[in-house]
Curated annotation (Swiss-Prot):
It is an enzyme of class 5 (isomerase). This is L-lysine 2,3-aminomutase. The keyword Phosphoprotein does not apply. [4Fe-4S] cluster binds at residues 120, 124, 127. Belongs to the radical SAM superfamily. KamA family. Pfam families: Fer4_12, Radical_SAM. Its cofactor is [4Fe-4S] cluster; pyridoxal 5'-phosphate. It catalyses: L-lysine = D-beta-lysine. The gene is epmB. Disruption phenotype: Cells lack CadA activity (lysine decarboxylase).
Amino acid sequence: MAHIVTLNTPSREDWLTQLADVVTDPDELLRLLNIDAEEKLLAGRSAKKLFALRVPRSFIDRMEKGNPDDPLLRQVLTSQDEFVIAPGFSTDPLEEQHSVVPGLLHKYHNRALLLVKGGCAVNCRYCFRRHFPYAENQGNKRNWQTALEYVAAHPELDEMIFSGGDPLMAKDHELDWLLTQLEAIPHIKRLRIHSRLPIVIPARITEALVECFARSTLQILLVNHINHANEVDETFRQAMAKLRRVGVTLLNQSVLLRDVNDNAQTLANLSNALFDAGVMPYYLHVLDKVQGAAHFMVSDDEARQIMRELLTLVSGYLVPKLAREIGGEPSKTPLDLQLRQQ
């Protein structure tokens, strides 16, 4: 439960303006970054037909101009590698395409996951839901009401997870309505929101949203999705400070990505940047084996070695848990770092 605080924050219109100011063409993205369109980069153009390219200019501003290997760019730029059909990779790696009701997944005993909205501010090329049938699980009040009725009928649930897409694509008044409905269900104690929007467009943390969280009787956790320290800037730190003041618990989960953050020093820099922003590292996921993203894969042995090195670089509280999600399993599966074998 949080306390009401009045804050000066960006207007609702500001984040919506930034949300609409996006680049959807690979050639334009490369031009903005002063990157010569080499043959390899041009070959990836048609991958936008597999999964649309979408990058807000506010996120592009944090990319290094002239660097085709920029870690933020690599997360969003189409690639010819997306056409590779890799063994063991599928369109539904987590076996999520069977909702208990439209838009609601009950994969874990005490938690249910609501797909609040299908869209995202940015399309990340490694997204494990890039093939998800959002058309069959639309985020609207009718489906939300059906989902809430299911939640109310299942007293084993004590935590709701808002996901997507990105749940913060919902307008402030929609989120306020959802929180009010959840607060009326006695067995729901916590709300966990997984979102990339606060890092992509920090202005999403509006005064109305902060006050909505401040009023809530639920324990609210925000799990940011941030993969590299270069994503973190002053506007993000200010947004997180506003949420901390009203009692929101701030966490982060990352994905271990080839040529983005697959070394210990990069992850140490990320953990330090997160902590400076008041955010605790939570999980580091090995890649979900979604079709079209095999080029981001880091092997388990490499991941363990990176984590063993990370342990020597930062304090223990800055080391995220290395884990993978396996479809059908009742929880995430931690990866043993095999420290005793070293």
